[in-house]
Amino acid sequence: MAIYTDIAAELYPPQKGEVPRGVRVHTATASGIGLVRVDIEREGLRRAKGRYITLDMPRFSTIDDKNEAYVWAVASQLRSVLPKEGLVLVAGIGNRAVTADALGPETADKGFVTRHLCEGAEAQDLRMRPVAAFAPGVEATTGLATAELLQSLAARLKPAAVLCVDSLCTASSRRLGASVQISTAGLTPNNAPALTRQSLGTQVVALGVPTVMEMDSGARALVVTPKDIDAIIRRAASLLSLAVNKALQPAFSVGELSFLTS
C-alpha cells in the first residue's frame, strides 16, 4: 500500500538524485532550518504545476512560537510567492472541533486583519496592507462547501490572493508537527473541490503543517497523529499567524505584530 503525502519534497526527495523531466529540486540550510524547494514545471506529474517550499525545523511543541528566526524563515518564503500589493484573504481551512485539523481556523483567528482600516484616505499613513481572514468551517456542520464560500467571497472582495492554511498529511514521522509547506498550486482539501486559481479566479497560495500520517497496519489503514498534537497546533498556529502577519505587514516588527494580535 502506498502511503499518501501532501509534501512534495517527499515525492521528489533530493537525496534520491534523479527527478522526472519538468521537476527541479533545490536544497539549502540556514540557522538550523532546512529548505527543500520543488518546482514542478509541467502538468501530468504527481502534483499540480507550481512551486512547493518545505521548511524543516524543530518540532513545534518544543519551540518558542515567537522565535524571530522561525517567523522570519516562514514569512520570507511567503513573501516570495505572494503578490506585493492588494488585499489578501486568509482562509483557515479545517474543522476546529478536531484537534489535528484545527490548524487553519486557529491560524486565521490570530490574523492581523486590516481591511476595515484601509478604506479611507488615511490608509497610506497607517503603513498597512488590507487583509481579511475567514474560517469557513466544514460542510458537515455548515451545509456549505468551502469552495462555494470562498468563490463567493473572492467574487465580492476581488483579493489579489487567497492564502489557504490547512493541516497536511506526511509520509515521514520526522516531519509530523515539524515542517511547513508553502505551495503556489493551491489546495485540495480532503474529499472536497480544489481551491485553485481556476476555481477562485485569483492566485491561491497554500500554507500548512503536517499533523497526521497514514500507516498500514496490515489488516487496515490507520491515520495517526502525535500525542502532543494539542501543543503542536497551538504553537504552530501562533507561529504561522505571526509569519503571515509579518509577510503581509513588513513595516511592523514581530514584537509589534505579536502585541497587536494578543
Task: Please report, for each region that a protein language model flagged, where it lies by residue.
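A structural-propensity feature for long, helix-poor, extended segments
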Residues: 126-154, 158
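N-terminal amphipathic/basic leader segments beginning at the initiator methionine
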Residues: 1-50
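Short glycine-rich or small-residue beta-strand-to-loop segments that form or flank ligand, phosphate
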Residues: 56-58, 87-98, 133-137
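C-terminal functional extensions of proteins
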Residues: 200-262
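An N-terminal, well-structured beta->alpha segment
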Residues: 41-81
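Glycine-rich phosphate/diphosphate-binding loop of Rossmann-like nucleotide-binding domains
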Residues: 95-129, 133
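Glycine-rich phosphate-binding loop
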Residues: 147-194
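Gly/Ser/Thr-rich loops at beta-strand to alpha-helix junctions
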Residues: 93-101, 140, 167-171
